């Protein structure tokens, strides 16, 4: 989104948060609204438009750099340096000169910024552009989109290819994004001769401004595409295949370049951000790149030693339990955990937990009683050294 558009928009209000809201509060507010307004969950057209606005707000406020620029821009136009005056956003980059001399607004802005805060020239560079002349305005890049994906634990750990269904502005399939009727090309603007700018003189000053005939694009579409009405964009439902990388964690945000909202008249598309939600697994857990599992064992398996068959992400592995292992001990199997982004795998951490039988009968009962007697005779005291 261009900075010049920030002046008229209150992103905090759109998300229902205060201007000093924490990143976590902004994230929670966006998720709540997105789940209700997403076109797949709410077919109302107004909900779709609102979803785009909410996504724009989150895209700016969730980025620390963009949020700072947004706050500075809003404060500047709220009545500070510019006294609350509104500026026509049709102005692009501009400069003024006369009698061979130039008046550099950036010098004024840089001096003003020395009182503290963001360089005001930088802000105006985004709002009106910098330079000695106007450049032809390019069609604006499409907005970024936000969506969510629910994954099973194993899918998140190993990675998965999955389809995502999106309803959003996309390049018009009829004109392929040009905005012109198929077979007819846009013509060069005769007012500005394709430059996109008009040079004017006022007294001692000369300045340039965007051409109002072609709106700074340098070309005019005389015969607009009937499908998109000349915008090059239509709203449609599309399905894209997304590769979720291995090792993603719950709440992680994945960027897919160029998969967002289409830009007007052939401009580049925005990006798609996918927030991953991982469903808990009844067997596996995770500690960073380590895979965790708690396995029930009998007392005799710990006391006498044994080999356990333990599940992993890729089948089972035999884990040796040393003789005399304590309940709750963690056994490590190297390289059998979650795939790492840098290559290789984390470890498998196996916690052994004794399962006590509720009822013993017959030979098992007698054998355990005999063991208890032998244990007492040996002088073994499990609470030796414990307590005060």
UniProtKB/Swiss-Prot annotation:
PROSITE patterns: DNAJ_1, DNAJ_2, ZF_CR
Binding residue positions for Zn(2+) 2: 189, 192, 211, 214
GO biological process terms, semicolon-separated: chaperone cofactor-dependent protein refolding; DNA replication; protein refolding; response to heat
Cofactor binding annotation: Binds 2 Zn(2+) ions per monomer.
Keyword Chaperone among UniProt keywords: yes
Residues involved in Zn(2+) 1 binding: 172, 175, 225, 228
Gene Ontology CC terms, in alphabetical order: cytoplasm
Pfam families per record: DnaJ, DnaJ_C, DnaJ_CXXCXGXG
Statement: the UniProt record of this protein carries the keyword Cell cycle: no
Cofactors: Zn(2+)
UniProt entry keywords in alphabetical sequence: Chaperone, Cytoplasm, DNA replication, Metal-binding, Repeat, Stress response, Zinc, Zinc-finger
Domain of life: Bacteria
GO MF term set: ATP binding; heat shock protein binding; unfolded protein binding; zinc ion binding
Cellular compartment(s): Cytoplasm
CXXCXGXG motif repeats: 172-179, 189-196, 211-218, 225-232
Protein function: Participates actively in the response to hyperosmotic and heat shock by preventing the aggregation of stress-denatured proteins and by disaggregating proteins, also in an autonomous, DnaK-independent fashion. Unfolded proteins bind initially to DnaJ; upon interaction with the DnaJ-bound protein, DnaK hydrolyzes its bound ATP, resulting in the formation of a stable complex. GrpE releases ADP from DnaK; ATP binding to DnaK triggers the release of the substrate protein, thus completing the reaction cycle.
Subunit description: Homodimer.
Domain text: The J domain is necessary and sufficient to stimulate DnaK ATPase activity. Zinc center 1 plays an important role in the autonomous, DnaK-independent chaperone activity of DnaJ. Zinc center 2 is essential for interaction with DnaK and for DnaJ activity.
Similarity comment text for this entry: Belongs to the DnaJ family.
Designated name of the protein: Chaperone protein DnaJ 1
